């Protein structure tokens, strides 16, 4: 399972979605062409970003099945690592956008 860190995007949801589709998506598609399951890692953002991020990950998962594509929103490396480990052990989970809270998320997910 490959991690793809999206990198900084504008604060506004519309501008962030536009930059993602114009600049980041081609790199994501190239990564998926390698044939490995993929986890996108976004920086945390407010609720206005949820819709476009979820739509992206769901469409990528549909178009690239049987590969699995999921997305996380987190800054905490331990939370990202725990979620990545969970997703690696959950073969039926795909097309999900999971905002993470690093406060205890690592321990909770590692017990699953």
Regions found by a protein language model. Give the residues of each.
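C-terminal helical subdomain
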Residues: 23-26, 54-55, 67, 72-112
């Amino acid at each position: 399972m490959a991690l793809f860190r999206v990198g900084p995007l504008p604060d506004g949801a519309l501008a962030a979605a536009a930059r993602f589709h114009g600049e980041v998506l081609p790199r994501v598609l190239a990564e998926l062409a390698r044939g490995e399951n993929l986890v996108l890692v976004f920086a945390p953002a407010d609720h206005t970003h949820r819709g476009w991020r979820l739509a992206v990950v769901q469409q990528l998962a549909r178009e690239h099945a049987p590969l699995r594509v999921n997305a996380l929103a987190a800054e905490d490396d331990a939370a990202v690592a725990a979620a990545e480990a969970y997703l690696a052990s959950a073969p039926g989970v795909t097309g999900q956008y999971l905002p993470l809270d690093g406060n205890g998320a690592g321990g909770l997910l590692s017990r699953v």
